[in-house]
Each structure stands twice: as C-alpha cells, then as structure tokens.
C-alpha cells in the first residue's frame, strides 16, 4: 500500500527532476547552473529516500547488483550535500558574497568522504531497514551525518548574514534564514536522537519531517525569489545583463 510519505516524495521528486530538465532544455534562457543542479539533486534525494521507492524497490535492485543494503539512504544523504552546495553557490553569487567557496566545497567533500567510509565500515550494508539511524553500530555514521549537516547549514547562515547586511530583511533573506535555521534545527534534532534514543519515542519522524520541510521550503523559496528578481532585471535596460550577475544586490544601491 502506498503511504502518504511515498506520494509526497514522488510528487516532490518528479517536480524537482522536471524543473531540472526544463532548465537544462532552456538553459540559454535561464543561464545560472546552480538552480538546475539543486533541482536535480533535491528531486533525486527525495525519491531515493522515500519509504516505498527507496527503502524497498530501489534497495532490492541495488542489493541484487552490489550485495549491499541501504545504498539508497547513503545516496540520498550524499545528494543532500550536493543540493546544499548548489544552493550555497547560487546564494553567494546572487548576494554578491565575495569570498570564494572552494574551501567550503572542500570541507563538504571531506565530510562526505568520511560519511561514506563510516557507512562501509558499519553493519548497514548487511541489514535491511527503513531507517539506518536505528541500526546498532551506526551511531558514528548518524552523528557524523548530522554534524556535517550543521556545518553545511552554518556556511549558509554566514551567507544569509551577508545578504541581510546588503539588502536588509527582504523576502528572499527571510526565506534564506528560515532554510538555514530549519536545517540546523533538523540536524541538531537528529544529533540528539543519536545520543538519546528515547527521542524516537517522542515523535522523531514527524518533527524531522516538519523541520526538513521548513529547511527545503526556505531554500527553494529564496532561490525562486532571487531567480525571478534576476530575470526581471535582466529583461530590462541596464539589468543584470549589463551590470553583472548580482541582481539581488543591485537593489541595495
């Protein structure tokens, strides 16, 4: 039986992949590559983490190919960082954040490598489950994943602060703060559940889902508002086509 979570993941996943495909086909019109990567990675991450498609269908398929369980969970976790990296790149460019992000991307890449190593060294590949965080012996993996999420969202918080100082409390800045703070709260809640297993009995999944929706909704809304603003400025005389890529920042001057 298809659950509500499966329907939600299917709708959001297909929507993300569809938006990514449209941006790829009409790339000359949209220009920026970061939202395209964000759409693809977020859509795939939601699909592979869905209870029915990811934990059952895809897990069985990958198990027959590789002999390892829970690869969809690992893939979904890694795609989360790809989506975050794309979002950070877009926000830094749109808000005129002058510091290069290669150090940030390097830190994220190292954290992803550690996560993969901890997964392969854990019992997760040999045990089929719907939530790998609950597997005995996987606390190190769960803790590292949550810690990596917090670090990544803190990078987003730094860019959010830069944007607030540049343009004030504009709608996209409010949405960006909602995304970063929601992400930090979600990761902190996951980290608490690792240290205190009783959190699983106190509505862990609903709380995690709600905080995840706040995080995703905030980031997606910020990207959408900034993209619309840039498109409007680019279509008019003296827009970002003439002034440069930092369309959102132009409003502060």
Please identify what each model-predicted range represents.
Residues 3-14, 35-48, 60-93:
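Individual alpha-helical transmembrane segments in multi-pass integral membrane proteins
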Residues 1-31, 145-162, 220-225:
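First transmembrane helix
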Residues 34-59, 173-193:
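Hydrophobic alpha-helical transmembrane segments of multi-pass membrane proteins
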Residues 125-159:
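Extracellular-loop-to-transmembrane junctions of the mid-late helices
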């Amino acid at each position: 039986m298809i659950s509500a979570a499966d329907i939600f993941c299917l709708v959001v996943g297909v929507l993300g992949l569809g938006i990514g495909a449209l941006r790829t086909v009409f790339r000359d019109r949209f220009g920026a590559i970061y939202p395209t990567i964000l759409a693809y990675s977020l859509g795939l991450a939601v699909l592979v983490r869905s209870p029915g498609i990811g934990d059952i269908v895809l897990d069985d398929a990958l198990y027959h190919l590789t002999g390892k369980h829970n690869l969809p969970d690992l893939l979904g976790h890694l795609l989360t960082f790809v989506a975050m990296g794309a979002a950070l790149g877009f926000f830094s460019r749109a808000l005129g954040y002058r510091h290069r992000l290669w150090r940030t991307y390097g830190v994220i890449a190292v954290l992803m490598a550690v996560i993969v190593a901890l997964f392969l060294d854990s019992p997760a590949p040999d045990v089929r489950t719907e939530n790998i965080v609950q597997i005995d012996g996987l606390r190190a993996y769960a803790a590292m994943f949550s810690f990596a999420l917090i670090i990544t969202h803190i990078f987003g918080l730094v860019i959010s602060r830069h944007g607030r100082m540049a343009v004030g409390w504009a709608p996209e800045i409010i949405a960006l703060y909602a995304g970063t703070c929601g992400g930090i709260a979600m990761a902190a809640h996951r980290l608490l559940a690792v240290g205190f297993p009783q959190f699983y009995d106190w509505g862990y999944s609903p709380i995690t889902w709600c905080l995840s929706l706040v995080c995703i909704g905030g980031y997606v809304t910020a990207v959408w508002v900034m993209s619309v603003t840039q498109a409007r400025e680019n279509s008019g005389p003296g827009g970002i086509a003439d002034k440069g890529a930092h369309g959102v920042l132009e409003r502060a001057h």
